[in-house]
């Protein structure tokens, strides 16, 4: 446990950051989940709309360091590939 006043303050700040970052990570997962649900339902329009909404959120979290930039790129790439496969299957 923190003994000095500065260590107590840092512990409090770290806990505050941890909970805020957890909230942001949860938000990213929700956006990704919305795209996946639309893909699973084979709803191309809804999937594209959800993907369009998710991309800026994923990028923003990568810029802030909430998720790694490579992880953001991997999510976008895989979701984009699934949507592309869905559109070719529908055509």
Swiss-Prot record:
The protein's role, per its UniProt record: Binds directly to 16S ribosomal RNA.
Disulfide bond entries: none
CC annotations in GO: cytosol; small ribosomal subunit
Extent of the signal sequence: none
Protein name, entry field: Small ribosomal subunit protein bS20
One BP term from GO: translation
UniProtKB keywords: Ribonucleoprotein, Ribosomal protein, RNA-binding, rRNA-binding
The organism's taxonomic lineage, starting at the top: Bacteria, Pseudomonadati, Pseudomonadota, Gammaproteobacteria, Pseudomonadales
UniProt GO MF annotations: small ribosomal subunit rRNA binding; structural constituent of ribosome
Compositional bias segments (type: Basic residues): 7-20
PANTHER family: 30S RIBOSOMAL PROTEIN S20 (PTHR33398), SMALL RIBOSOMAL SUBUNIT PROTEIN BS20C (PTHR33398:SF1)
The family this protein is said to belong to: Belongs to the bacterial ribosomal protein bS20 family.
